[in-house]
């Protein structure tokens, strides 16, 4: 699904990612752990080109999305991302937050289809003709129905018309996750989704992520939650100083780490 080849990222003289090559297959749940400053979050942000790689390839569905000639927005629709600090719009209600991107993307697609229909009628047959197209009102109604169903899934349908400022951190993060799901992504990237939460709120977010794992959602997760890595990951990767030092299945990774650096890290966090 995603094939990263010789990925490098530099900020001036600071070489953050160093020749990273890794494949992520459909249905995998890859958990990335490591000390702060090891490049984990930068790697994640490069995967959907929120950060432009200095060099290397990120091949998604056969296309190098790191190539600046590629329309990255076409591919970002298929790669969801959940941030550490939720990134909800405080001036919009919960349901508006969930609906915003799906409505914008679908409206844009309909406008393009209408343009193609017009060109087709003028005789430019290379443009596809779409028989029936939804109105803006129909798009909004459909996306609202989908957003409501997602809120019901996490038991927060009564929060639909409330604003993010009235929610707990755990509620905000679960809404951020279903906002990503509303785009029907093929893969979701999680950047330390529980690190900004109070300890008592962590469990509800991890449970939702475990549910997604059971549904075989492709996930790449940067986290310090070792329990989640053990239970939900299909593969665990250890990063340090911009490199992927070690990777293995959770059972083998935690019971029999190979590198001294990984052994030292696990000895400090598994207490």
What would you call each of these model-derived segments?
Residues 182-186:
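A short, proline-enriched helix->beta-strand linker immediately N-terminal to the Walker B motif
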Residues 64, 99, 103-158:
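Conserved ABC ATPase "signature" region
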Residues 163-167, 171:
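Conserved ABC ATPase signature
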Residues 48:
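Helix-to-loop junction immediately C-terminal to a conserved catalytic motif
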Residues 56-67:
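Conserved ABC transporter NBD signature motif
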Residues 65-80, 104, 134-144, 214, ...:
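ABC ATPase NBD coupling module
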């Amino acid at each position: 699904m995603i094939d990263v080849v010789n990925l490098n990222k530099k900020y001036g003289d600071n070489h953050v990612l160093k020749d990273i090559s890794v494949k992520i297959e459909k249905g995998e749940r890859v958990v990335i752990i490591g000390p702060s400053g090891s490049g984990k979050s930068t790697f994640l942000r490069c995967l959907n080109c929120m950060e432009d790689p200095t060099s290397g390839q990120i091949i998604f569905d056969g296309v190098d999305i790191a190539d600046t000639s590629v329309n990255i927005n076409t591919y970002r629709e298929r790669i969801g991302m959940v941030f550490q600090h939720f990134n909800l719009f405080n001036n919009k209600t919960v349901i508006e937050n969930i609906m915003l991107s799906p409505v914008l993307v679908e409206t844009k697609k309909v406008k393009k289809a209408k343009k193609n229909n017009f060109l087709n009628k003028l005789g430019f047959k290379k443009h596809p003709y779409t028989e029936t197209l939804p109105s803006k009102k129909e798009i909004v109604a459909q996306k609202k129905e989908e957003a409501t169903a997602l809120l019901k899934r996490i038991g927060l349908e009564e929060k639909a018309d409330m604003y993010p400022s009235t929610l707990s951190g755990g509620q905000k993060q679960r809404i951020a996750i279903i906002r990503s799901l509303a785009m029907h992504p093929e893969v979701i990237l999680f950047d330390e989704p529980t690190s900004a939460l109070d300890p008592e709120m962590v469990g509800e977010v991890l449970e939702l992520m475990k549910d997604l794992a059971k549904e075989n959602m492709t996930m790449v997760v940067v986290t310090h939650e070792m329990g989640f890595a053990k239970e939900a990951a299909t593969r665990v990767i250890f990063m340090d100083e911009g490199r992927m030092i070690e990777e293995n299945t959770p059972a083998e990774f935690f019971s029999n780490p190979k590198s001294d650096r990984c052994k030292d890290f696990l000895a400090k966090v598994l207490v």
